[in-house]
Amino acid sequence: MCGIVGAVAQRDVAEILVEGLRRLEYRGYDSAGVAILDTECNLQRVRRLGKVKELADAVDSNPIVGGTGIAHTRWATHGEPSEANAHPHVSGDISIVHNGIIENHEYLRALLQERGYVFESQTDTEVIAHLVEWELRSAKSLLEAVQKTAAQLEGAYGTVAMNRRDPERLVVARSGSPLVIGLGIGENFLASDQLALLNVTRRFMFLEEGDVAEITRRDVNIFDVHGNAVEREITESNAEHDAGDKGQYRHFMQKEIFEQPTALINTMEGRISNDTVIVESIGAGAADILRNVEHVQIVACGTSYNAGMTARYWFEALAGVSCDVEIASEFRYRKFVTRPNSLLITLSQSGETADTLAALRLAKEKGYMSAMTICNVAGSSLVRESDLAFMTRAGTEIGVASTKAFTTQLATMLMFVTALGKQKGVINPQKEKEIVTSLHQLPTQIEKALAFDKSIEQLAEDFADKHHTLFLGRGEFYPIAMEGSLKLKEISYIHAEAYAAGELKHGPLALIDADMPVVVVAPTNELLEKLKSNIEEVRARGGLLYVFADEKAGFEPCDGMKIITMPHVSEYTAPIFYTVPMQLLSYHVALIKGTDVDQPRNLAKAVTVE
């Protein structure tokens, strides 16, 4: 959600700033802007509604020469998408960009209006610009003005300030919204995501909660929430430099779907041997923590929540440990009871999901024995603040609709559940070997699922003119139906719902008619015959059935029911396997409908505000 890029350099920074924004397009936005101090210390600001390309074209047509600048992509929260509401915002000599939500902006706006400030936008961000300008009147430096401003702000923010009268300096403040500083030679940078800066540096410092930093070409000085000078660890990133390249694929989502076999190999490398899960790969002290776990609480949002819902079945059936799963935005506001020896697990692709991060911090206060995150971004807030971090290693995921991050989350969870069950003496060596063997086979099985791409593309034509779709599953395949439903609604804008198939009689059957496609996930398991009865209930009411069925399940196509016969796979990895056709179906339906597959309307990749 929103993207920030900043630079202080001897060279011209316009191209660096715009390229940084381009690399952050996947996060979702509706407008973009840049502000640069030129060689005469005049502020040159360009803002555009729409894509970064429109901003880039505007900057190219009137090149800006200058070494200090800030840039931003905005995802509207306060105020409609418009050029007037686009960042950077200006107050006197001060320019500001900001991610997050200032919760007391109405009070501050009224206060500033009493002081004579005139607001040109509907945003909460403009409040910060005017506050910094006001504080600078009495402060000794921009740093002091930003520190005094930050003390007045309530809510989440990652903000950058630039002063026309102090042209080789940026000051940044972070509270609840991530910011990273990129270190160069005689130049320094900042961004909301290190991906924005991988073309200019590999050395990064991640700001912590409450940090304020002063950045010049030669120095970075960081101060904590109390104003004390602090040092932050410098890390070297090995993230993919060309992650923003689609290669031979039409969309990033398509690319990421087809990257899943390789991503899963990376996820499992060094974590499983021929027949065991390597407990030490989870992290130092993991073995002792796992032995004491009596309950697991999973907290997540969106696709990650669906992964958690799937893993719940594994925790209880395989490891014998009770497990609850809750949406982070609900968990953090509920008066819950912390069970003894309860392990909190957070799931997040970005590691910066605002509600999930807040839930982690709350859980620490409430006495959870330990906290682990399953995450895709090293150095993210969830990774830094958790006791254990089990990385998914999916590689950079650009498409807003998550694909490889989901399947690698599931594989990571299955490895963790196996390790937990082993440490607690519930999973014996024979069962562990069966699970590990199925994991070794998984990348090849995913390749087989991807081979259905063309047949699913033809199937997608049936959905293009539909307005609603129902997804059904039972047991651990109910969350897979949930994920299929989420993918379809995210990128095709078709209203889709998922139900446990046994719930049909309790409401959903009222929706069934000849215009309602019903997608069913039908592996071979102990619930197959029950599921077949549910399918017959839909057929009897004229529903259009599309059944993704195990080859051993005994389905035959008939009027009103199309069967997509899938290879038989292990019961342990079947939920991961059946995710892939759901992804392909959603992708091809969206393609036919002509929607923006990689950046669907109103959505953002990393939800860093509540």
Swiss-Prot record:
One of its GO terms (molecular function) is glutamine-fructose-6-phosphate transaminase (isomerizing) activity. The active site is at C2 (nucleophile), K605 (for fru-6p isomerization activity). PROSITE patterns: GATASE_TYPE_2, SIS. One of its GO terms (cellular component) is cytosol. Its EC number is 2.6.1.16. It comes from the Bacteria. GO terms for biological process: carbohydrate metabolic process; fructose 6-phosphate metabolic process; protein N-linked glycosylation; UDP-N-acetylglucosamine metabolic process. Transmembrane segments: none annotated. Residues 286-426, 459-600 form the SIS domain. Keywords: Aminotransferase, Cytoplasm, Glutamine amidotransferase, Repeat, Transferase. NCBIfam families: glmS, PRK00331.1. Homodimer. This is Glutamine--fructose-6-phosphate aminotransferase [isomerizing].
